[in-house]
Amino acid sequence: MTKKTKATSGADEKTPSLPQYFSWINSTNEGSTEKQTIANLEYFKWLHDKYGMKLKIYAWDAGNLDGAGFYDNPYESEKLKKQYPNTYKPCVDKAAEFGCHLGVWGGADGFGDTPEEEQKRHDLLVHLCRDFGFMQFKFDAVCGWPREEKHLAFKRAIDECRKYVPDLIVLNHRLWLGEGEIACTTFLVDGVETYIDVHVCNEISGPHHRMYPLSRPLIPGLDRLAEDHGVCISSFVDNFEDDLIIQAFSRCLILAPEIYGNPWLIRDDEQARLAKIYNVHAKYSDILVNGMTLSEEIYGHNAISRGDGDTRLITFTNASWLPKTVTISIGEEIALADCEGKEYIVKSIHPYEEYIATAKAGDSVTIEIEPARAALILVQEKSKFEKDDFVLTGCKYETVYGPGATPDKVRIFKADGTIGSIGNRSVDYAAINGDSTIARPVYLGLLKTSPIPANLEQLYEATCFAADCDSLEAQSLKRSGDTKVPEVKAARDAFFNQEAYIYRGTESRAMFDGDSDTYFDAESKFMATRLDGGCLRVDLGKEYDISRIEIESFVVNEPTHEIREAHFEPLAQVSADLANWSDAPLHGVETTLDSYTIPVILASVHLTDHCEGKKCTATYTVNASARYFRLPCPMDRIFSFTAYDMNGNKIDLCAPHANNLLAPFDKVSFISARSLTVTLPEDYADGAYIAIGTDGIHGDEGVYCTIEYDGKQIGAFDRACCYPMNNWEYKAKTANCGFTYYFKLTPDMKGKEVKLHAFYKNECQVVTRAWVCDTNNKQPIAELNI
């Protein structure tokens, strides 16, 4: 194919990267709205005004022009008029307030069957660029496959668009465009999306869910006219920074840094960190286009050096539990040029900023790459560094940028009392000592073959009851907590309050919120996310004397693909201790509302329809003291779960926790076990956790883990690859290797003995090890103005 140039394709291999966000899984195929988009743009404007972060492109994904399987027109479509009653202009204007341009997802055809229809589609695309300054089109096979006879029509339209927006970026997602391909800027690498634990997941054990990006293959030849789908910030957001460092500085494609999803779900303190990555990339964007792969034998897997003859930014990765030592040769080996007699500053930019060394050409500088992390190292000629940059000595820190991307303050995470500075900035400080950096994992030991314990059911149920099967976005919100930033809150609210999210019934709290129209579990049946039929498990928070439990759910009049025939399991069970279970038989099913219309999200297109049916309440007789309730093959679309005391009064549950997708105990079979009894360290920090990781092929859902401490069974609150979940966009990825279970540690467990268990469903050659890991949520010991 003809070599792509700026004239033919909007960019070439030496075009500096364009920083971008795109809206996939902020909405799905139904598309966004003006209100939701404005809320998101206000968030990015806040990042711009507060931290100087520059976003060049905000790209709508599916459903905002074309949809899944159809083409559309914002001036004719009732759907789009409802979404954007004032056309796209209010969103265009809001983006322009902080120097941003819009882009949109669509199909590469839509040119109709007549010359008039072809011209109409042509004119629409040109209009978006000429009148609204659209800077990106993403053309995706999900919309439809372009007809061969329309390839030239596609090319003519894009060529005309570039008369008004010469640097228009056109993404080709999985399409054959023939003669029109030259008009496209990029292709999607391996067709891979990067929604963590939905489309990609860990294949090895690790302390977090983002091990895959640390070992993702490089693009052959370091081709930059490609698209890697960016970094998804929506699920399991811990360590998004490492993922983004690799995307922006290692691959450094034409779109970088590139994120998508829901970045407002990270913590408030992490927002400055996100902006910093964008700001550092912008500072060096002109020279980052020049990259080279370093020797794997010397520098490790996927080490990349980018820059010019005086300045190199080197990205390292470490996809292991142990620190990795790397020795950097200051000279031509990392692509420095004309370096004889020169001195260089070596500075860590990520995961912490830190002065490493002042070195001469020919020197070797040794650094350590933290376990399960990425690292970004700057090597720059000394006089240039002192003019353009700064580094603090005697500490590990991170820079917080202010308006205009100017360094404003530093957060100190570790200091030895001798903080100094090199370069064009200094700090006002008192003597500071302390360390709040993320501690390295502490090895506990290898789990070894042991008899299957007599209380296997109790141990299995402990982890099943601890599991979170809510949407991954709901889990991210719980992880990050409340925000004090109005723009962040508005973007979060816009996401969680959209109908397409609510109608999927992804959060178990709907059963307890007192709202008669919210429900839990709308898609587990037709999405086939239930394991062996699933099991509704409810931890009531504490033990109660219970007479009966009532569960209200929806019963459809005529089953559809999305709403299956209702089923009421005849026998539930309750327990006070997960070991001893008593039966709670179904007493009866009563119609509580004989006519009810429920909204339903249609599969694939994600548009809203409605189905007729009724509300029914199933009553289970308990007459026991219990904390735990389990019901195999449960009903779906559950409006409420209510327990009653022995006097028939409704119990106000203090802290219920529920899930619905893991297999009933009588449907699973474990054939072997391993265990480890170990004394925990005395000095772990608040928020620390135990990780039990299995490396090797264990089979789908092939290993489960639990711990015992002080006579109690403690289940894993999280797992990588994740537990099955009530999905937002798509169901959790299945994985047959690399499971890691995570268990919360409490202060009373310090220095105490615990027993770690692993149970296996298959004969497998695996290694299962345990570690104590530090929390990602570490706060600085000081904050200094610069």
Regions found by a protein language model. Name each.
Residues A357-V410, A430-S471:
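C-terminal beta-strand-rich structural cap/linker in extracellular carbohydrate-active enzymes
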Residues I57-E241:
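Aromatic- and carboxylate-enriched substrate-binding clefts and catalytic-loop regions
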Residues A319-D338, D408-D428:
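Surface-exposed beta-strand/loop patches in extracellular or lumenal glycoproteins
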Residues M1, I158-D159, Y164-E354, G362-L376:
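Active-site-proximal substrate-binding groove within the catalytic cores of carbohydrate-active enzymes
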Residues E333-Y355, G434, H698-Y704, Q713-D718:
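Short aromatic-acidic-glycine turn motif
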Residues T2-L41, Y51-I57, D61:
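An acidic-aromatic substrate-binding cleft motif
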Residues N290-T311, S383-T418, L662-T679:
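Surface beta-strand/loop "capping" patches
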Residues R273-V280, D286-G291, I298, Y429, ...:
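Disordered, acidic Ser/Thr/Pro-rich linker "stalks" and the adjacent N-terminal cap
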